[in-house]
Amino acid sequence: MKKLISILTAVLTLSIVASASVTENSVEYDLYQQNAVIHISNRSDYTITVKVMRISGGLYATRTIGPRGSSSVSFEKSGDFYTKTKAEKGLETLYKKGSSFNVYCEADGYTEGALEFYVSGYGSSGQSISRAEFEKNY
């Protein structure tokens, strides 16, 4: 069973655009459980810090990614998450809260997804947040 979900979300005031795609993979054997994984790519000239937050509360993971870099976050359990993102370049710092997403990680399958972040000067969508809100880990 494979599902492909594409999401395009504009993030940050000069607008960091995060696009996501998710594939759910079926596991034929119940002998082991594969971890879910989300690959994060920074397609901008900004250094970004992405906080993966549990919707039920609390910080799950933080990744700081340099310009044009990438990283991954592994998940051992299913859950609902969202991102808080900070983009920095010189004296400019932008903060946004991203849309929610679901991660599936069970004996019968797991999520493998991708988030790509872009910084664009064409408007913004998503929720702007303050530095204080970004710094909170709950």
Task: For every predicted segment, state its role.
Residues 4-18:
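Sec-dependent N-terminal signal peptides
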Residues 9, 79-80, 109:
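Amphipathic, positively biased hydrophobic alpha-helical segments used for protein targeting
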Residues 20-56, 61-63, 84-138:
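Primarily secretory-pathway and cell-envelope proteins
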Residues 65-72:
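Short, solvent-exposed S/T- and G/P-enriched segments that are highly enriched in secreted/extracellular
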Residues 72-80:
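Short Pro-Gly-centered beta-turn/loop motif in secreted/extracellular proteins
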